[in-house]
């Protein structure tokens, strides 16, 4: 598990991959939950829908993620539930994965934290 303060302090860290496992409209900020004061994603996050992770074997997951086994990944969603499933799959595939339990529900409430919206360049 990772807390907000640690994640916020590591934005831009090239050794950490932030993985948003929500739906694509949630990731881009086109749709979200009315309870959140803003929509979007954590800056620098990559998108990979949780259903894609849960349907694959370890080698398939590594191919989807595109990172070497052992890479450090933080997964988040809206409230930490989908990302908990994602972390389980990522760990089974050999990643050092942690769940940001507060997820977008917590991040979106902090006006002092940056957010991105729209399409994103996904690393290949």
For each feature predicted by the language model, list its residue ranges:
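Rhodanese-like catalytic fold shared by cysteine-dependent sulfurtransferases
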Residues: 1-17, 21-124
């Amino acid at each position: 598990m990772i807390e907000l303060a640690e994640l916020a302090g590591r934005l831009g860290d090239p050794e950490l991959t932030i993985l948003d496992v929500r739906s694509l409209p949630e990731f881009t900020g086109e749709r979200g939950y009315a309870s959140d004061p803003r929509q979007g994603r954590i800056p620098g996050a990559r998108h990979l829908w949780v259903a894609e992770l849960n349907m694959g074997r370890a080698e398939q997951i590594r191919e989807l993620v595109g990172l070497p086994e052992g890479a450090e990944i933080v997964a988040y969603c809206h409230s930490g539930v989908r990302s908990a499933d994602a972390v389980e799959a990522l760990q089974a595939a050999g990643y050092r994965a942690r769940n940001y339990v507060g997820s977008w529900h917590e991040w979106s409430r902090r006006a002092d934290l940056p957010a991105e919206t729209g399409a994103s360049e996904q690393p290949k």
